[in-house]
Amino acid sequence: MRIILITGISGSGKSVALNVLEDAGFYCVDNLPAQFIPDLARYLASEGYTHLGVATDIRSRESLEHLPDTVRELAETHQVEVLFLTASTDALVQRYSETRRRHPLSILTDGVPGSDGEPAFNDRALMEAIEMERELLSPLAESAHRIDTSNVRTNTLRSWIKELIREDSERLTLLFESFGFKHGVPSDADLVFDVRSLPNPYYDLALRPLTGRDGPVIDFLQAQPMVLAMAEDIRAYVEKWLPSFIADNRSYLTVAIGCTGGQHRSVYIAERLANYFRAHGNVLVRHRELAPAT
């Protein structure tokens, strides 16, 4: 049986994800304590079911500590995947403000109704509840496939989940490619970032024969605030728009990073980005002027 467990921060889209599973033919259960999942899986398997989707979250907080053990037990006889949905605190506060729903851990301000007769939320208490939930769930996030929905519309999230659960496809593969502009821009690049404005190790004679993978060059570039800022901006851009590319049913997304010769700056940035995004799934690195894809 294929079992997908959905957990994560309240308000991050778990209900949307569970609905996608149900539409795809999964037998779905919401808010099921973790310790009950193995018995349910055994029963459903005996009845001929092959797909199970379960959402478990802070509403069953006492049982969450059992989830890692539950996953290990299920994995002995089933195909098990864990999706952890999250979002920024600002995004979550905005969503709760729009829906007027209570956070499971939120504290109401003296229980006094607002002008519309509904309980008045204390935004500070809400943010504290969100951060408390993050802390409680952080052990689960570390071992799950994390999905950040902060900047993701509902339709995009649905498409993303559909892609993740497809039986006949693998995840999108991110390819980070360094190159030198003097040799031309890669024709297969989906996104191109120009880092030629960054400080250039080429002008240090001791660093000139090295590459962006060598320690002295890495130390040089990491000491430059401008380099770190540009790397962070590129990372944020790719991470924000990655769901759109996944929803487009792509197999690969090629992100090209170019400097003058393709030896120092672009190599360093490509390696730095690849190291970050490896937590998201399949990642390749290609240094066009140095070596083939790895």
Swiss-Prot record:
Residues annotated for GTP binding in this entry: 57-60
Transmembrane segments annotated in the record for this chain: none
Record carries keyword ATP-binding: yes
MF (Gene Ontology): ATP binding; GTP binding
Keywords: ATP-binding, GTP-binding, Nucleotide-binding
NCBIfam families assigned: PRK05416.1 (NF003828)
Function text: Displays ATPase and GTPase activities.
Protein name: Nucleotide-binding protein Reut_A0350
Taxonomic source organism: Cupriavidus pinatubonensis (strain JMP 134 / LMG 1197)
